[in-house]
From Swiss-Prot:
This is Autoinducer-2 kinase. It comes from Escherichia coli O9:H4 (strain HS). It comes from the Bacteria. GO terms for cellular component: cytoplasm. It is found in: Cytoplasm. Catalyzes the phosphorylation of autoinducer-2 (AI-2) to phospho-AI-2, which subsequently inactivates the transcriptional regulator LsrR and leads to the transcription of the lsr operon. Phosphorylates the ring-open form of (S)-4,5-dihydroxypentane-2,3-dione (DPD), which is the precursor to all AI-2 signaling molecules, at the C5 position.
Length: 530
């Protein structure tokens, strides 16, 4: 690709728009992958009265917030808009946007929208109860988070919107459209709709036909890193970017995060530790799990897919524990000028591996086909205050997060026959040195910690640079820009101890699921349609 910019002539930068579940960020990077500035705003999704589980995406307000973030990032960076060489967008997966035939966005929902539980149940009954299996084999997705039941819900309950709908995209594509006026989706994000074929990396309209839904709403598919268009004059006035700035196709947050971590080759493995924890393994060719426990998504690297297992609310559980039980530690940490989690890890380091047998019951390993969890609890507590205290419970939570990750990675190995030799640990969880070491000890693998731990925006910026002709290859650039802070090596004796802890936890968790099944306790989370 011919260069649109010549970086040697002046100082150019790249902008990434990162639309997460709870916030929107505009992040500016230099061409060496260094973060220069950020603009950020929280956003909230709208629960519709009398529509249980609904979480609509506020298109008008959220576009205003995105524009404010872009202006804020430019201001904080102290650079003129003409030095932004290109912009791209990434977003939470599963969130969808519908447009009418004039190109006006008319409806959107966030990834957490769970209104279509009844529709999921109805769809599962199609084709003699084989429809979900057919969707999974083709797309790597089940119906729980798919766009298909949401579209069916609109057909049932908001036929006015359903009839008007002319095009569907993801939220990252909506941001790019608002900037450029060009509509397209990329495989990595659109793959989470349950409508995109893993092998062809293109839509599979037959799935909509099978569900009795319209198949004429599917937008063009373009690979991540493709030049989509340029910032329009109208958008430039609102967001502060220069009209004519290249707008590049972005992608899904996890896949672009892996690009930013240099996880771009077959068999490379990452654990992304945020609100949810994703365990991701790169597969050289599309293959799905016969047990339907693991989702499979297109990578942003063409031809490659990612097996992904998800631990539910891992980071959120830690935050709950800190806020509910550690007010004293928060005050002490503030006086010491350190993070509360750092103080808790220092306290926890004196607790022996295995946490005196305490077993947290929060997220289960991923069971994509029948995805639900036990009621949150701690099992096997002691009334000895020297053995059972805040430090013990905190370590038990860190160990349990690592155990669930190891279970999820084992599920991927079982069907893919890929056994990684190491893994990358990123996201907020990787800031904890003890937690990183525990993950190494539990998994039995060396754990590499990057300097840039929140790598999604960096991966998005790399895509922008490829689309502008600044970088020649996403994979090579991702590998070149990633820098490593430290490596944690597993201790064999601790790994053996944790294997025993893992076996006991799995047996206890299965019993706890039985309490939910009998209506005696309330699940941490249950997928729509169960």
């Amino acid at each position: 690709m011919a260069r649109l910019f010549t970086p040697s002539e002046s100082k150019y930068y790249l902008m990434a728009l990162d639309a997460g579940t709870g916030s929107i960020r505009a992040v500016i990077f230099d061409l060496e992958g260094n973060q220069i500035a950020v603009g950020q705003a929280e956003w909230r999704h709208l629960a519709v009265p009398d529509v249980p589980g609904s979480m609509e995406f506020d298109l008008n307000k959220n576009w205003q917030l995105a524009c404010e973030c872009m202006r804020q990032a430019l201001h904080n960076a102290g650079i003129a808009p003409e030095y932004i060489a290109a912009v791209s967008a990434c977003s939470m997966r599963e969130g969808i946007v519908l447009y009418n035939n004039e190109g006006t966005p008319i409806w959107a929902c966030a990834n957490v929208d769970a209104r279509a539980a009844r529709e999921v149940s109805e769809l599962k009954e199609l084709h003699n109860n084989t429809f979900e299996n057919e969707v999974y084999r083709a797309t790597g997705q089940t119906l729980a988070l798919s766009a298909i039941p949401r579209l069916l819900w609109l057909a049932h309950h908001r036929s006015d919107i359903y009839r008007q709908a002319s095009t569907i995209t993801m939220i990252s594509d909506w941001l790019a459209y608002m900037l450029s006026g060009e509509l397209a989706v990329d495989p990595s994000n659109a793959g989470t709709t349950g409508l995109l074929d893993l092998t062809t990396r293109d839509w599979k309209p037959a799935l909509l036909d099978m569900a009795g839904l319209r198949a004429d709403i599917l937008s063009p598919v373009k690979e991540t890193g493709t030049l989509l268009g340029v910032v329009s004059s109208q958008a430039a006035e609102l967001c502060g970017l220069k009209a004519g700035t290249p707008v590049v196709v972005g992608g899904g947050d996890v896949q672009l995060g892996c690009l930013g971590l240099g996880v771009v080759r077959p068999a490379q493995t990452a654990v992304l530790g945020g609100t949810f924890w994703q365990q991701v393994v790169n597969l050289a060719a599309p293959v799905t799990d016969p047990e339907m426990n693991v989702r499979v998504n297109p990578h942003v690297i063409p031809g490659m897919v990612q097996a992904e297992s998800i631990s539910f609310f891992t980071g959120l559980t830690m935050r709950w524990f800190r806020d509910a039980f550690c007010a004293e530690e928060k005050l002490i940490a503030e006086r010491l000028g350190i993070d509360t989690y750092t103080l808790l890890e220092e306290m926890t380091s004196r607790v022996p591996p295995g946490s005196w047998g305490v077993m947290p019951i929060f997220s289960d390993r991923m069971r994509f086909k029948t995805w639900y969890h036990a009621a949150p609890s701690f099992i096997n507590l002691s009334i000895d205050p020297d053995k059972c205290n805040k430090a013990t419970l905190f370590r038990a939570l860190e160990e349990n997060a690592a155990i669930v990750s190891a279970c999820n990675l084992q599920q991927i190995a079982d069907f893919s026959n890929i056994h990684p030799s190491s893994l990358v640990f990123a996201g907020g969880g990787s800031k904890g040195k003890l937690w990183s070491q525990i993950l190494a000890d539990v998994s039995g693998l060396p754990v590499n910690i990057p300097v840039v731990k929140e790598a999604t925006a960096l991966g998005c910026a790399i895509a922008a640079g490829v689309g502008a002709g600044i970088f020649s290859s996403m994979a090579e650039t991702g590998e070149r820009l990633v820098r490593w802070e430290r490596t944690h090596t597993p201790a064999p004796e601790k790994h053996e101890l944790y294997q025993d802890s893992r076996d006991k936890w799995q047996a206890v968790y299965q019993d706890q699921l039985g309490l939910v099944d009998h209506g005696l306790t309330t699940s941490l989370w249950k997928a729509p349609g169960l």
